[in-house]
Amino acid sequence: MKKPHVQQKTERRISAALRLVLVAVLLLAQIALVLVLNDLLRQRMAIAYTLLELVALAYVFRINSRPGGSSYKLGWTLLILTVPVVGLILYWLWNGDHPQKRLDLKKLPRPQESEARREASRLQVEKLRREHPEWGRLAAYLDRQGFPLYTGTGAVYLPTGEAYLEDMLERMEQAEHFIFMEFYIMAEGQLWDQLMDIFRRKAGQGVEIKVLFDDFGSMMRMPEEAVEELRRIGAEVLIFNPVHHYVNRLYFNYRDHRKIACIDGDTAYTGGANIADEYANITERFGYWKDDGIRLEGQACWTLTREFIYMWERMGGSLQQEHDYYRPQSTAAGQGFVQPIADGPDSNPVSSAEDAFLQLIGGAKHMVYITSPYLAIDESMEKALCMAAGSGVDVRLMMPGIPDHKFAFMVAESYFGELLNHGVKIYRFTPGLLHGKTVLADREAAFVGSVNMDYRSFQLHFECGTLLYGAPAMETLLEDMDGIMEKSRQVTRADWEHRPLLHRVLGGLLRPFAMWM
């Protein structure tokens, strides 16, 4: 006899919870084993222990001489200097010098662009450079990183998670050839049930369906039974970087934090929202969940489709057709320029997303508005914000009124004092969690995507997003940001100075270790 649907979901949640407990126990066991090994070496093998201390000291110099952010260097330096052997072993296990070795990703080239496409992008860059030299420089830089600049693309900014996800599902209903999805979190719930209904119908019509999600992000939310159901209806599923396969993966860095949906090559989505009920405010978590996203139609969709294909094939997946089959088949009407980008730890020390943020902030002459749920930035980003505000640019940072990670928000607060001193205006979204990740500069250039203003997004996770230059969607983004500030409380210097003592103490103590939060 078939079990009731509610009972099945309850059993799945229990199974997922047990898996998380197992991973937590293994992680604690790993740390305990390192501590025991440290104690044994210190007591019984003094010479070996001393040699490891010297090696640890050498690693401190090595870490600080390599390219990378100061926050990353400071965190590891403090840990290794405080407990040299423990810190050294954890560095070997959890970080290493080559993040790509922590991932089972094949070394493959990205799907290649034709010379005609590369030349078209260069011509568009020159056109943008003539109209807006500062944004032309940014577009040229990203073009050299392999992210072409496009016209012939429509862009629609979707100002809430509800609008974003509803629009996405409506377009999936119209799919005729393929649906590709890559998300950090996929979770059972009402939204998932709607998506599964679409998948069943489309799989029955012969539509190619591929789903890729991050194991850590979805661990408690997407049980194995749901994955098997996906496969039974004909969808292909890959799970990014399973945390339980190897001891050195019992960690939450090097995750796939992207949000990508590609439909028939001509439509693509990215933004801040994942596939879970709270993002559409079907269920309430942390008050009102304010998210956003963007829909692209036309030529620029190829970059997001290409990045999905690249990740899929590096994880060992295969396609039913050649790469060119998945390219856009139409050109959409749209003003301005569109430039989707992607980023990941395997490209370090180059960070396309962080560099784009720095140039958006540094290139602005009048205003820079930013939304982000987190703030854990390097000295270069903090300096860019302070210099922009100090030179008369209207810099505004919008953050949650109800944060989802309290310790992470204490770290964010630790930056407020310096930013306020230089004239940065900070707003906290009173109704709840502001989860969107956007930047708007001078109403001329903007970013919408998955990238938080923190070290993990800039250096440790796989991310994506879209740059807009002179596109009408930026006016919708500006209206949304104005609406956010109307519902927000501006943080004053007095507010910051009188924050709870626990926030002041923990914010300062945890700040060097933000890469682990």
Provide a role label for each language-model segment.
Residues 184, 249, 373-374, 408:
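Glycine- and other small-residue-rich loops at beta-strand/loop junctions that grip anionic moieties
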Residues 393-397, 401-453:
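C-terminal structural cap/anchor segments
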Residues 185-190, 370-378:
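Short, glycine-rich nucleotide/cofactor-binding loops
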Residues 354, 382, 412-416:
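A general structural signal for well-ordered alpha-helical packing
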Residues 359, 364, 374-395, 400, ...:
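Helical hairpin unit composed of two closely spaced alpha helices linked by a short loop
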Residues 1-355, 359, 363, 403, ...:
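N-terminal localization/anchoring segments of enzymes in phospholipid and broader phosphate metabolism
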